[in-house]
Amino acid sequence: MAANAEPRRRPGVGVGVVVLSCEHPRCVLLGKRKGSFGAGSFQLPGGHLEFGETWEECAQRETWEEAGLHLKNVCFASVVNSFVEKENYHYVTILMKGEVDMTHDSEPRNMEPEKNESWEWVPWEEFPPLDQLFWALRCLKEQGYDPFKEDLNHLEGYRGEHLERTTKTP
């Protein structure tokens, strides 16, 4: 690499978790970000995929670390490619879906108050507007994903086009 060449940037890899509970029918667990990029936007539990970790392990770990909940029946839900050039943000996020394991605590606790205002159960059909959702969740909603359907039809034809560029890249 030439001395003045910019180092090549690579997207991050994250895992987001669509958390469901039999005690809150047709609701999904949502938090509100604070103190970091995307402050004020609504988010799912989730975070970085650790080296050597499976997607399911990451979903379990992040949900426990952030909301104090144990999950069962964790499965793949979707994948999104979120790129916002003006924010220097590019993540590929694997979305997993899981149910609260009712043999443990069934209500979320805010385990990271410096990063999240609170957790609440929100009906899927009554989600905040898209512009109030953090990138991965916004892309998931734009795909037409429905956590209460078992099919993956929302991925038909998806090529990772949830991108916001200020300039065209060749």
From Swiss-Prot:
- Note from the entry: Has the ability to complement a mutation of mutT in E.coli and thereby completely suppress the increased frequency of spontaneous mutations.
GO annotations under biological process?
A: dGTP catabolic process; DNA protection; mitotic cell cycle; purine deoxyribonucleoside triphosphate catabolic process; purine nucleotide catabolic process; regulation of proteasomal protein catabolic process; response to reactive oxygen species; xenobiotic catabolic process
- Oligomer status and interactors: Homodimer. Interacts with PCNA; interaction is disrupted in response to UV irradiation.
Q: Which organism is it from?
A: Mus musculus
Protein name per the record: Nucleotide triphosphate diphosphatase NUDT15
Q: Domain of life here? A: Eukaryota
Question: Would the keyword Transmembrane be found if you checked this record's keyword annotation?
Answer: no
Q: Where is this motif: Nudix box?
A: 47-68
Tell whether Magnesium is among the UniProt keywords.
yes
**Nudix hydrolase domain: residues covered:** 8-144
Q: Which residues bind Mg(2+)?
A: 62, 66
What EC number(s) are associated with this protein in UniProt? 3.6.1.9
Catalytic reaction list: a ribonucleoside 5'-triphosphate + H2O = a ribonucleoside 5'-phosphate + diphosphate + H(+); a 2'-deoxyribonucleoside 5'-triphosphate + H2O = a 2'-deoxyribonucleoside 5'-phosphate + diphosphate + H(+); a 5'-end CoA-ribonucleoside in mRNA + H2O = a 5'-end phospho-adenosine-phospho-ribonucleoside in mRNA + (R)-4'-phosphopantetheine + 2 H(+)
Cross-referenced Gene3D superfamilies: Nucleoside Triphosphate Pyrophosphohydrolase (3.90.79.10)
> Which UniProt keywords are present, listed alphabetically?
Hydrolase, Magnesium, Manganese, Metal-binding
Q: Name one GO molecular function term.
A: 8-oxo-7,8-dihydroguanosine triphosphate pyrophosphatase activity
Gene expressing this chain:
Nudt15
Checking Pfam families in the record gives:
NUDIX (PF00293)
What is the main EC category here?
Answer: hydrolase
